[in-house]
Amino acid sequence: MGTSPSSSTALASCSRIARRATATMIAGSLLLLGFLSTTTAQPEQKASNLIGTYRHVDRATGQVLTCDKCPAGTYVSEHCTNTSLRVCSSCPVGTFTRHENGIEKCHDCSQPCPWPMIEKLPCAALTDRECTCPPGMFQSNATCAPHTVCPVGWGVRKKGTETEDVRCKQCARGTFSDVPSSVMKCKAYTDCLSQNLVVIKPGTKETDNVCGTLPSFSSSTSPSPGTAIFPRPEHMETHEVPSSTYVPKGMNSTESNSSASVRPKVLSSIQEGTVPDNTSSARGKEDVNKTLPNLQVVNHQQGPHHRHILKLLPSMEATGGEKSSTPIKGPKRGHPRQNLHKHFDINEHLPWMIVLFLLLVLVVIVVCSIRKSSRTLKKGPRQDPSAIVEKAGLKKSMTPTQNREKWIYYCNGHGIDILKLVAAQVGSQWKDIYQFLCNASEREVAAFSNGYTADHERAYAALQHWTIRGPEASLAQLISALRQHRRNDVVEKIRGLMEDTTQLETDKLALPMSPSPLSPSPIPSPNAKLENSALLTVEPSPQDKNKGFFVDESEPLLRCDSTSSGSSALSRNGSFITKEKKDTVLRQVRLDPCDLQPIFDDMLHFLNPEELRVIEEIPQAEDKLDRLFEIIGVKSQEASQTLLDSVYSHLPDLL
């Protein structure tokens, strides 16, 4: 029997699903295996990196042995031999070691903390004693001083710490401080409106707002018939709401009558108290307890208060002998609302106005810099390097001759152009080096590629353009770019050129010539071999001979990989470590202080007891390192190399 088309389609789809599931499972298993292998390899790598070693001279055999360092908190009580491992012992009381080491004695802890300082860290096997000031005090001139107390009206702007004093500031508008304190900030005024209260007395920088209750009339029992709310006219006059339209003497009678026409009616209806006497005569004799609040009224409005009294009294008469369950609220009286639209004070807004102005100036500078840079990048150097130098000389103080002579090293009466030397060696790598030096775009690289025929011409033009684009171009940056692209052979050629006794062969420094105006015109020389090379036979002036070549960090960078040779002019003082290299290390250490103890621990086996005593007497760690350079530098090249390796391993920023 034949199969139907629908069944064949279903079988095909099932097979595709099965294949996808199988592929997914295989990929998942491979990922799991890769993850497990990575996680198992990491502990092994960490374990191998945790173990440090040191070198020890066996006094019995005179051999230099490599021993494992002791962990932190211990010291080497017995060094290793050919048949035994080193023995570590715990640091005794009063001593410590922070790192793994190969020393024979732990470091002494610092002196006990002088009064009133307290111990922040105790003296232990792993840590030195650290002192600090107690709470409420800060360190000032090697002693502790109490934090400043902010007076009344002032609050804490910045809390004090162990090393800084308290900073106070005057309470701003809307805040106050009523107690002197060294920890409290200014507090905000009490919000009377949120508590259904009014401000009776506004706050100041030293006091809070004084709030009061709203005026209200409350009665425990309703007035009985025949009993007036105000039994005497004097009482009514005492508690009568005063009016802002008070009629002084000398006012005409019509105005006074019209202003008082309302109150006589109210008083007469109250004072007469002629209410029909029903069966509640006994209750009429009962006393009526009334509470009339004594308020401080600030502003009074005549119209609303009088209308309130007219509405209030008839309601009291109508509810004769019944108790009033609803309190009678009076008009809202309180402190007048402060005027929100006050005069503009320039002193209050001056700080943020200055900040906005500085931000505006910064934005303008950034925009102008970006536009100038974009115009420079768009132009693209399609002309020869000599024209580039001439155009750059119109805008900069440095002339083309000065810029060219900056990269020329004079040796035996001949001027050797460093840029030509590098251009002749890098070949097609000039693109990567040029992009690394000045972040050039593909368009600029293409301009050099299309403008010249040979790679050394393109490289020389690109390097000259790099030196013209910014005055910060230096030999140190060029060497860094060469090392970045693994051209240490070119760096060694430059290094050999700068050495006094090393002479480079002329044919190795020769740069192929072309009819293009690439090479600067050298001074004629009778030697035909020098005419076809990149050597410039320019006799330097006495000033040029005396001044250094590239006054920057170029020379330490050239010699950071090893100690200088014994024939170098920089090592003629008997030291295997050049002065420039030592000064570079010490300058970096003084700029960025760090823990130098591991370096001293690594070099202990090279020092005799007298040298160790001399170094221990020096108080500053940087001066100790300087003295260590002087001592180790004259011992041997192996000791000098060990010191440099230790410095570069513990201070990686120097690389």
Swiss-Prot record:
UniProt topological domain (Extracellular) ranges: 42-349
Annotated transmembrane regions: 350-370
PTM section of the record: Oxidized in response to reactive oxygen species (ROS), leading to endocytosis.
Composition bias, Polar residues: 243-261, 268-282
Segment forming the signal sequence: 1-41
Record's keyword annotation contains Membrane: yes
Domain of life the protein comes from: Eukaryota
Keywords: Adaptive immunity, Apoptosis, Cell membrane, Disulfide bond, Glycoprotein, Host-virus interaction, Immunity, Lipoprotein, Membrane, Oxidation, Palmitate, Receptor, Repeat, Signal, Transmembrane, Transmembrane helix
Tissue expr: Detected in fetal spinal cord and in brain neurons, with higher levels in brain from Alzheimer disease patients (at protein level). Highly expressed in heart, brain, placenta, pancreas, lymph node, thymus and prostate. Detected at lower levels in lung, skeletal muscle, kidney, testis, uterus, small intestine, colon, spleen, bone marrow and fetal liver. Very low levels were found in adult liver and peripheral blood leukocytes.
SUPFAM superfamilies: DEATH domain, TNF receptor-like
Glycosylation-annotated residues: N82, N141, N252, N257, N278, N289
GO BP terms, alphabetized: adaptive immune response; apoptotic process; axonal fasciculation; B cell apoptotic process; cellular response to tumor necrosis factor; humoral immune response; myelination; negative regulation of B cell proliferation
Result, substituting N278Q: Abolishes one glycosylation site and reduces total N-glycosylation. Abolishes one glycosylation site and reduces total N-glycosylation
Chain's role: Promotes apoptosis, possibly via a pathway that involves the activation of NF-kappa-B. Can also promote apoptosis mediated by BAX and by the release of cytochrome c from the mitochondria into the cytoplasm. Trophic-factor deprivation triggers the cleavage of surface APP by beta-secretase to release sAPP-beta which is further cleaved to release an N-terminal fragment of APP (N-APP). Negatively regulates oligodendrocyte survival, maturation and myelination.
Quaternary structure and partners: Associates with TRADD. Interacts with NGFR. Interacts with CASP8.
Protein name: Tumor necrosis factor receptor superfamily member 21
